[in-house]
């Protein structure tokens, strides 16, 4: 959320508008994400992949590989952290994700074996793809647009935290469209207000 106080965002539009851009981006993003049922679709994909790859029900290798891959990939932090890294905003979110994934993988590997370690391959490819998207966005977006996108990402991180701590169950993946909408709303506020 420190991006909210970024001077490029604060100076790009009239006083009070940066928070409106962030809130409106989250609102419209949540509406789009809920309409598209992003969270439900990700869960459905995970369940289908898991059942199709583990037909015999006896292979802990496949169970470990699929379960770990899905848990480490299906989540907003994998996308948000990789995009932030690609845009040059730092790797702090990826470090947080890696730490959480590391502890989770220890628990999984104890019961499911070496398949958990091999899940790092699809996770690496997935995160690299999102980092490439971030590299592209970082080259075409203005600083204030990146700050708006990062501020929205900070709100998503709060949602992820509440979910992980079991304080509030939120469909954070449904808020992912807000990341794409925030730079557009920031541009509109910058040019027309």
Summary of predicted features, one role per range:
Residues 1-44:
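Membrane helix-loop-helix hairpins that form the core translocation module of multi-pass transporters
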Residues 116-158, 163:
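Alpha-helical transmembrane segments of helical membrane proteins, especially in multi-pass transport
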Residues 60-136:
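Helix-loop-helix junctions within the multi-pass membrane cores of secondary transporters/permeases
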Residues 162-181:
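Interfacial loop-to-transmembrane junctions
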Residues 183-193:
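Juxtamembrane boundary at the C-terminal end of a transmembrane helix
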